[in-house]
Structures are given as C-alpha cells and as structure tokens.
C-alpha cells in the first residue's frame, strides 16, 4: 500500500465538509468546512486547501437514497467533483456516502453533546467518515 495523501469532501448545497487522510494509516481528520451558495463553493478557498495539502486523490461523497437510487444532490455532487478535476487537475474518486452524516453526528455527540453538533463540524466529520469508509473499501 502506498502513502498517498487524500482529501475528502462531503458535498452540500450550503456547506461542504472536508477531511484529510493518509492511505498508509487509513485514518482521517476533519478540516474546516466551506460555506457554499446553492452548491457553489468559494473556489479560491478550495484552491488554497489543495495547494496546501497537495493531495494525490480527492474523494467526493456521493449522496444516494437508502435504496441506492440517485437524488437531486447526487448530480450536484458529481458536478462538484467534475469541476474539481477540471479546475485543478486532481484525480477524483466518488464514494457512496449513505449514513455518513448519521455516523458523524453520533461520533460528535459522543465527544461533546449537543454543543458539538454545529453544521460545519457535522459536515467535516461526515467527510472523515466518507474517507475512512473509502480506505476500508480499498483494503477489503
């Protein structure tokens, strides 16, 4: 296994969570979430993040319904991933993110109760769950 640096995004129309991880350890940590306007992030802040961390791969969570069907935000997440690739030339992987927010909320609540459940924290914690789930899938 290589030691690639990987960034994950939990796409949302109002907030986009971010996490960074190392493939060798299979672990991730939350980064600051980005505010978005109708799904459009501040691309300068995204560019700054990518320049700072220089990821080998970017994983974008793909929001699906529980039965695996797509929803409106699924297509928006795909567009976000395509724009990341087009603007910055980064390699992209899409990853099923079903139940990532539920797991992230539970993890945050366990650590800090209701006070820990602000929107940005939940979105970035969801990005951690997405990335760690992606790592697990690569091993399995």
Swiss-Prot record:
Its main location: cytoplasm. Could be a nuclease involved in processing of the 5'-end of pre-16S rRNA. Keywords: Cytoplasm, Hydrolase, Nuclease, Ribosome biogenesis. The keyword Thylakoid does not apply. It is an enzyme of class 3 (hydrolase). This is Putative pre-16S rRNA nuclease. Its EC number is 3.1.-.-. It comes from Serratia proteamaculans (strain 568). GO terms for cellular component: cytosol. InterPro entries: RNaseH-like_sf, YqgF, YqgF/RNaseH-like_dom, YqgF/RNaseH-like_dom_sf. SUPFAM superfamilies: Ribonuclease H-like (SSF53098). The keyword ATP-binding does not apply. The gene is yqgF. One of its GO terms (biological process) is rRNA 5'-end processing. Belongs to the YqgF nuclease family. It is found in: Cytoplasm. Gene3D superfamilies: YqgF/RNase H-like domain. GO terms for molecular function: nuclease activity.
């Amino acid at each position: 296994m290589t030691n690639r640096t990987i960034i994950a995004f939990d796409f949302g129309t109002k907030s986009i969570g971010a996490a960074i991880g190392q493939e060798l350890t299979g672990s991730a940590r939350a980064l600051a979430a980005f505010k978005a306007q109708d799904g459009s992030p501040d691309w300068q802040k995204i560019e700054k993040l990518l320049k700072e961390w220089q990821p080998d791969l970017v994983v974008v969570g793909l929001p699906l319904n529980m039965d695996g069907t797509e929803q409106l935000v699924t297509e928006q997440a795909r567009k976000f991933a395509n724009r990341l690739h087009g603007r910055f030339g980064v390699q992209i992987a899409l990853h099923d993110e079903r139940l990532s927010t539920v797991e992230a909320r539970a993890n945050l609540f366990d650590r800090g109760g209701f006070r820990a459940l602000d929107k940005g924290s939940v979105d970035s914690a969801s990005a951690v769950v997405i990335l760690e789930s992606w790592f697990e899938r690569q091993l399995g």
